[in-house]
């Protein structure tokens, strides 16, 4: 059951250049994904440059900003293709409603017969381990990343917050220090943001 601790901001759906949909937040003047391609961005940043570079056989992954579930879904598909056991934790402050999830229609676009799994990501209970397949376990947290006390240790972090200029509270040095402490030695943090200040914070942490 969702706790609805916050009110989800108004959202509109837009189709990006690769044909996949994303969400636009008018209050922030910001999209959830690149308008050049939501699917393309997620695949490149989080799978190709993140998961596929993680050498841990059975990685524990933490996503900051579960959002549309696209990164989680692509990771699930990779776990099936590679027969690789993955434990996936995702934290989200503003869970999407059912109507929005269906309108995004990622399952039809890229699911290849795994539509049930995509919707299972969003239907999974919060705050407990849910086994979506023999190789993929999901643990969803409904909460505020800036206030949450993580208990696990992670091999790979998907940092998928909005841009620093749109959501500066998510990019504080102290938060990257928290992430560093919950990562296993040799862990990887991947994010779409390549600004110099972000690189320096990661190096300092």
Spans of features found by a protein language model:
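Glycine-rich SAM-binding Motif I of class I
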Residues: 69-73
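A short SAM/SAH-binding and catalytic strip from SAM-dependent methyltransferases
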Residues: 155-170
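S-adenosyl-L-methionine
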Residues: 100-151
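A short glycine-rich, Lys/Arg-flanked "PGG" loop and its adjoining helix->strand segment in the class I
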Residues: 170-185
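Conserved beta-strand signature within the Rossmann-like core of class I S-adenosyl-L-methionine
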Residues: 185-193
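Local beta-strand N-terminus motif with an aromatic residue
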Residues: 58, 153-154
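Rossmann-like AdoMet
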Residues: 1-59, 76-110
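Conserved Class I S-adenosyl-L-methionine
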Residues: 196-205
